[in-house]
Amino acid sequence: MKQSHFFAHLSRLKLINRWPLMRNVRTENVSEHSLQVAMVAHALAAIKNRKFGGNVNAERIALLAMYHDASEVLTGDLPTPVKYFNAQIAQEYKAIEKIAQQKLVDMVPEELRDIFAPLIDEHAYSDEEKSLVKQADALCAYLKCLEELAAGNNEFLLAKTRLEATLEARRSQEMDYFMEVFVPSFHLSLDEISQDSPL
């Protein structure tokens, strides 16, 4: 049986730090970011279904979100100001991401490839799926800004402002619900979020 390096590569996502050009009170790696995006994307899908008449597969959304940055294990996490410096760079980076996604898919044993390819190749996402994952991705970046600012790190002030504009552009009913119900707690201390539910 032929060996596959697929999961050995994915395990290295934890070695790639996000926000590499900014001082961080606490560094965040791509692996933990992907887990948070998966949880938030699942929540957005569940909220959409339960509250706003949606009909999306929340579990699939969580899986797509879990793999949404998988190609960064081959490309690294390019800082946003570089990635979107101009339209040409953004377009070229998209092409590089596509190649990296295909390279990852090709690592999967052929008999399993049809399972993993639609998770890694974002071109297999429906528009609705892509929208939910992008909303969750932006929300998690925004939450990171809130955490850094709460720790006194003003380095994230402009990033927060930029992400507020991104969230506004991707705004949805499910995002509004999430922002109203879950986000305010990110401004609180551990004692404040624990006082209602002591162990």
From Swiss-Prot:
Protein name: 5'-deoxynucleotidase YfbR
Record-listed a divalent metal cation binding positions: H33, H68, D69, D137
Cofactor list: a divalent metal cation
Family under the similarity heading: Belongs to the 5DNU family.
Keywords noted in UniProt: Cytoplasm, Hydrolase, Metal-binding, Nucleotide-binding
List of residues binding substrate: R18, W19, H33, D69, D77, L78, P79, T80, D137
Catalytic activity annotation: a 2'-deoxyribonucleoside 5'-phosphate + H2O = a 2'-deoxyribonucleoside + phosphate
Keyword Metal-binding assigned: yes
Taxonomic superkingdom: Bacteria
Predominant location category: cytoplasm
InterPro entries, A to Z: HD/PDEase_dom, HD_domain, YfbR, YfbR/HDDC2
Annotated site (Appears to be important in orienting the phosphate for catalysis): R18
Subcellular compartments: Cytoplasm
Database matches in Gene3D superfamilies: Hypothetical protein af1432
Subunit structure and binding partners: Homodimer.
HAMAP family (alphabetical): 5DNU
